[in-house]
Structures are given as structure tokens and as C-alpha cells.
């Protein structure tokens, strides 16, 4: 088992190669084709849209998303992509779990210290556990939080932890707007609920009086099966990419046989382009206008932020 995180050079390479990580058929599927292109499109770019549409499942087509007829032992093949802005997110991917932490900025402190502390503690717990020990996401997060508090780290962090146990049970614990979605047959079947005091003020783990701590943490579980795709990330992902857009990217990636790393890079690269697009609305911008409809000023386009993406593809344990 090993810690798998991007190094600084890999992050820089991701930024340099962002446009190459996002195929034009993905851009066409999510409405970015007129804003970012890596190749010159034909006179009628409808052919690119048609090509993209060929990979997408019709909206009217409903897929059953129960536990499946045959329960099969599965495992996670995971990878990540991190595109920094303030460079205050932290994450890691482990054979037993995927863990993501997003900063909660405070004036005068290292905003990323708390999220990095959470990740360091959680990872240390995993690598020192006996092989085969089931991972309880809530307990892992709770212990990591306690150790981070004891370290004296300032600031705060949202977090999400996912693990696979009992052969085919996906378990999770999260707090704030670090989030996840489980996709089956290209559709979101389970989605975390955003936790916030009010708009753009998420719950978080922190060390000051009045911080929520673990009391508002959400937990749950579901049975997964081969072919499911789990996507976790910080708000930099989900503030810029809607669930419907995430479905399109995953559908195309699945049809093209993307590896988890390819999928994470494509999702991260697409979210990065969305965050910097002023002409295409993001989920954050839409919600901002709802919350400020009686005020002067407007917010359009994407929301620039650190973007962390973890993708876990559920595969047969025999593969």
C-alpha cells in the first residue's frame, strides 16, 4: 500500500497540459466548445457535438440502481488530480480509502495547514493498521481531527472519506462542501448533501470555539457493483461542474475506456476550464444570483479555486 499524491512537478505538468487533458468531445458535451479548443473545428462544429452525443446516454433512459442481482466482491482502482490555485487543498489515495480535505480560509493563518494535517494523520493511521483491517470513515476522520487539533494547526478544513468494506459496501463520512457522487450506468445514484450554515459558508473542522467539529459529520453506506464510478472532490470541482455535466464526462470517459487517472485528469481539467470561463454559468454562479436577487451586482461564469478530484472505479476483485 502506498501514498499516491501529485508532486509539485506533476501539478505543474497538469497545469501545462490542461488543454490536452480535455478532449474536444468532452468540451462539446458540457458547452465549452466555443471557449477552449485544442484543434481547429470544421466549418460546422455540429459534427463534434454529434460525436460527443454518441457517447452520452439519453436523458429519458432510466437505469435501475439497486444493489444488483448478484453480489460480487469488488475493489477500488483509484487515482487523483489536483489543480491548485491557492494550493490549500490536500488529499491522498490509498488502497483502503480515498480522502479529500479542503481549506477554510482565515485571516492571518496558513489556510492549508489544517487540511494537510488532517490528511497526514489519516494516512498515518491507514499505513500503520493491520492489513485487512476494515476502515470506518467516521472513526478515521474523528481521530485525524483530534490529532490535528493537538498539533496546534490553525484554520479549518472540510473533508470527505470513502472506503470499501465487506466485499462490496462503500462507506463514507464527510463534513462541509467537500463532496462525492456515485455513478452507475453513467448516472448519479448517490450524492452527498452540501452542509453549510448559509450560502458559501460550509461547516468545517476547526480548532476555535464555535467551530462545528464532528458533531455535524454525515455518514452512510451503500452496496456497489462492478462498473460503478465514485467521484470525490473539493468545492472547486462541484462549484464549477454540475451533476449533469459530471455524468456526461464520466459517460464519455467510460465509453472511451479511460483509466481512473485519465478520468480524474479529464474531470479536473474540465472543471479548471469551467472555473475560468466567464460566459458559461457554473452551479456556484447560479446559486449566487438566487441568494442575491434583491441586491446590486451579478456573478457569472466559473469560480476560481483549488480543484481536487479523486476517482475510484469499482472493479471485480478478481481482475
Curated annotation (Swiss-Prot):
Enzyme class: hydrolase
EC number(s) given by UniProt: 3.1.3.16
SUPFAM superfamilies: PP2C-like
Molecular function in Gene Ontology: metal ion binding; protein serine/threonine phosphatase activity
Organism: Oryza sativa subsp. japonica (Rice)
Record text on cofactor binding: Binds 2 magnesium ions per subunit.
InterPro entries: PPM-type-like_dom_sf, PPM-type_phosphatase-like_dom, PPTC7
Record's protein name: Putative protein phosphatase 2C 23
Residues that, per the record, bind Mn(2+) 1: 102
Cofactor(s) this protein requires: Mg(2+)
Binding site for Mn(2+) 2: 235, 305
Family: Belongs to the PP2C family.
Source organism superkingdom: Eukaryota
Domain PPM-type phosphatase: 73-314
UniProt keyword annotations, A-Z: Hydrolase, Magnesium, Manganese, Metal-binding, Protein phosphatase
The reaction(s) this protein catalyses: O-phospho-L-seryl-[protein] + H2O = L-seryl-[protein] + phosphate; O-phospho-L-threonyl-[protein] + H2O = L-threonyl-[protein] + phosphate
